[in-house]
A protein has these predicted regions:
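Sec-dependent N-terminal signal peptides
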Residues: 2-10
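Extracellular parallel beta-helix/beta-solenoid repeat domains
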Residues: 10-316
Length: 316
């Protein structure tokens, strides 16, 4: 009986929570422009991966990349559509197949990581349609990846946002990691309807074109004990990007904890380290989502409330 129960417990575990086979490891580490579909736990022990990696759908739940200090880098420059590592949901009939419990650990990532539910791969049709229904936040979160852990990763950004957490993604953890290189935008973007991220104990040495972390209609996140070198740019901005691409933002950037972070290199005249309510509708496209009685369609304001900001320091 005990053996039967143990077997059932193993069968009930995440489908990709098993060691990669030798054949899978060889395919993963083969240089290619074609993304490798990861359905196992890869312990690379320092071996480099020279191709994009795709972790997609419920069948990839429990998958892991443990690089042992090795590098992940595609043969071509990473883009938003073909990222270095993609953790994506997939349309499955009337619903969505989403991965959960994915880990990326001890890797050097050249390019970017994209975590997406609705809108994965650049198709905005489902996201736009869902946003025009009153239960959009719940639907987006049910469709999106959850419990993705990023531990001791060095991001070497090459222009695009190194870590994008897409609409509805929940419980993302980023710890002990370093953001370096350059981004024309931010280092981390927490997009609308996402929630529950923990960003703790990281170093931001990256040069960005704007603030380091954008909290865009994302709630209940914890950004704690990080070190930011701002190079004259902003730090952490909380807002709601009303109307962009016609998508209605339902959730507000509320109930976030931003504490015990250290900022250096802030602008002398206007040091903007943590800004709660950074936009308040001041964008030309805010009217593009007009016509519905909820979310940013009804109110262009950021609506930030219940945020805790304390213990942060600015050094020169």
């Amino acid at each position: 009986m005990l053996a039967l129960l143990a077997a059932l417990a193993i069968q009930a575990g995440p489908p990709a929570a098993r060691p990669c086979s030798t054949a899978e490891m060889n395919a993963l580490t083969q240089r290619s422009a074609e993304p490798y579909r990861l359905l196992c736990r890869a312990a690379l022990a320092g071996r480099d991966v020279r191709r994009p990696v795709l972790i997609e759908g419920a069948e990839a739940s429990g998958a892991a990349l443990d690089c042992g200090g090795g590098r992940i880098e595609g043969p071509d420059e990473a883009t938003t559509r073909v990222p270095t590592i993609a953790v994506w949901s997939r349309r499955d009939g009337a619903g969505w197949s989403r991965p959960s419990g994915v880990t990326v650990r001890d890797c050097r990532v050249t390019g970017n990581i994209r975590i997406w539910g609705m809108g994965a791969g650049g198709s905005m049709r489902d996201l736009l349609a869902s946003s025009r229904t009153p239960g959009h936040t719940r639907a987006a979160q049910a469709a999106a990846p959850t419990q993705v852990r990023i531990e001791r990763v060095r991001f070497e950004a090459t222009g695009t946002i190194p870590l994008y957490v897409g609409p509805g993604v929940t419980r993302t953890t980023v710890t002990g990691s370093t953001f370096a290189g350059r981004s024309t935008s931010t280092a981390i973007y927490l997009d609308a309807e996402s929630a529950g991220a923990e960003i703790r104990g990281n170093v931001f040495a990256i040069r960005t074109g704007r603030e380091q972390i954008a909290v865009d209609g994302s709630g209940a996140n914890r950004i704690v004990d990080n070190r930011f070198a701002l190079h004259g740019q902003g730090g952490i901005f909380l807002y709601r990007n009303c109307g962009e691409d016609g998508v209605i933002r339902h959730q507000t950037p509320s109930y976030n904890q931003i504490t015990d972070n250290v900022f250096s290199g802030a602008a002398w005249l206007r040091p903007r380290t943590v800004v709660v309510g950074a936009r308040e509708g001041r964008r030309r496209y805010c009217g593009d989502d007009a016509g519905w009685p909820f979310g940013s369609s009804a109110d262009d304001g950021d609506g930030a409330r219940g945020n805790r900001v304390s213990g942060n320091r600015t050094t020169r």
